[in-house]
Amino acid sequence: MRELRRLLGYLGPYRRDLLIAAVMIILETAFEMVIPVLMADIIDVGVANRDVAVILQRGIQMGVCALLALATGLLYARFTARAAYGWGANIREAQFERVQKYAFSNLDKFETSSLVTHMTTDVTVLQNTVNGGYRPLVRSPVMLVMGVGLSFWMNPRLALVFLVCAPVLGGVLFVIVRRVAPMYGRLQKAVDRLNNVVQEGLTAIRAVKAFVRGEYEEEKFQGVNSELMETSQRTFRLAVLNLPVFQLVMYTAVVLIMWLGGNMVLNSGLQVGQLTGFLSYVLQVMNSMMLISNVFLLLTRSLASARRISEVLDENIVLDSPEDAVEEMPDGSVEFEGVSFKYHSGAREYALSGVELHIPAGQTVGILGGTGSAKTTLVQLIPRLYDATEGTVRVGGRDVREYDLRALRDAVGIVLQKNVLFSGTVRENLRWGKPDASDEELWAACRAACAAEFLERMPKGLDTDLGQGGVNVSGGQKQRLCIARTLLKRPKILIFDDSTSAVDTATEGKIRTALAELRDVTKLIIAQRITSVMHTDQIVILEDGRVHAVGTHESLLAGDPIYQEIYASQMKGGEDHGVPATEC
């Protein structure tokens, strides 16, 4: 319940709507509870004495009560819906804001599909609990108290039937809730797995078709879909036992009251109208108890969702800006002092070990290494996408942990290995680099990245729609747009993470020439092609997470065997791209 109480704090201004809705429910219930008393008067006084005036008077009063109950019920529905959907929107927004603050190490703990489920399905469960459960949560106790009270007022002996039924219903509810509670958690995890398969299959649909793996993906989907179906069936098979058991007890109570009340009517101890009114209260009380049981089941499921949402909100953010953070980076110098790094504290091996490296401001540095040599890991420590496990990373002469995160990352531009574009136009995507960039600035960045040559051929130019993930442009065009977007930031440190692999060597040469014109910008170029880095000021060779060698093209070619092997394989008829393959 602690998690659910905490999430109620996100109601904000919608608390007022819930309070008004509660008042409407109480009024609605009160109007409904008066109707059986009026009905008893019609039978026992109006019909028995053939008093038409009493019948009309009580009939009009019943109609007014019914209309007032209808009006208050409609008002309740309006206020509750506003509160439920407003609450859900606030929780989703809080989760999304929290995820935006996550470091990479935080994101590594969650699957993307799981986060989507947390923000959609789990929030919907909470909304449905308010929409479907708030009414009986308020109404049922009021109806129960008023119904039992009026029943004892009408006939204490018949009302004793409630004292027999209540323990039976309470025991059944306790058993069901205790069994169902853990099953709802498993149900939501099954939804996670289904969403993961769906997302993965749709994201990689081109690869699925290219490898003709449609049947395999269908079988995988059928597996998780069947798991979700079976988990749902097991959960709700037990949950729905609530209804037949409660109906059995309710109808048993009605039969007992009819039998006892009938005998009392025959013995003149009870009037027919009183028995009719009493039966109305019995049905209302029993229905209220059934509704309370449904509320408990709704709360049980919502608790499972609340715990999952709290996992996102309570995730400890491992990277944050310090107090009195430095807001300005003096220059683009980079230093690694005894840096070691592993992705998880419990990991046996380090991804990076004992890295010592000094890169003066304004230098262009190439980084080479085989697959798994931790090239990307190395550069991710510069903008604090991860923190070094041991040692210190310095930028501009200061420990990166002293900088304000936003200021640090604004001063470091990264062109990612995986090209990421968003739905929208070219202009909207480029302005991620500089939101207020003019068209002149956009075109200048595109020319530097050799993107202008294909954009100028497009009828809409910068207003060309890229489609979801940039599906309307080729891989090489995506790379050039990503480069242009990063150049717009005008960073002090520019990192290319194998970011020209999809462009031809001539285009790469033009981009390299444009980059050379950027003064006072430190450029780190991760590459597989030796031609991409041979003209840099220095080249760093990584091997198994360690710095193997540092030097210029000439010095490494003269004295480093790994560099010589790469050069020979790529420049003398070996592999055209990348580090030479090793035997599997």
Describe the role of every protein-language-model region.
Residues 35, 39, 76, 80, ...:
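Hydrophobic/aromatic residues in alpha-helical transmembrane segments
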Residues 49-50, 85, 93-123, 196-220, ...:
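Short intracellular "coupling" helices and adjacent cytoplasmic loop segments at the cytosolic face
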Residues 51, 55-57, 150-164, 234-307, ...:
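Helix-loop-helix
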Residues 13, 17-30, 41, 65, ...:
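Transmembrane helices of ABC transporter permease
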Residues 328-584:
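ABC-type nucleotide-binding domain
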Residues 1-32, 39, 47-62, 72, ...:
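Membrane-integrated ABC transporters
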Residues 13, 101-105, 121-130, 134, ...:
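An intracellular "coupling" helix at the cytosolic face of ABC transporter transmembrane type-1 domains
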Residues 26-34, 67-74, 126-129, 133-145, ...:
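Hydrophobic alpha-helical transmembrane bundles that constitute the permease/transmembrane domains
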